[in-house]
């Protein structure tokens, strides 16, 4: 099992248990075990340097699997998944309970890939599909 935890700058965080491994050298069962044990941290335990697009897509799929595990609504989860860019090209939300937030009743994902934003209104926002009223607007640009 992959034991080293590192950040995307490649620096060791001091918790080396065994050498990190390439996602391409793991099988689906091992990747599931990594998710079971480390959640989003599983991706940090794989040493792929993001120059290999095949390995990057495997990491993206691992990330997608974990988002689907955390976000209880499948439609919302799909709106949060990286499909159109390699993992690491946009900020990755690992440790902030970001994805858990979407399970709260008062939180709604407005996926601008699915419905275009028309305007910000005094009480919220209007998209091509709906009007949304809210107290707080979070712009997440990646």
Language-model-detected regions and their locations in the chain:
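N-terminal FAD-binding dinucleotide-binding subdomain shared by FAD-dependent oxidases/monooxygenases
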Residues: 1-142
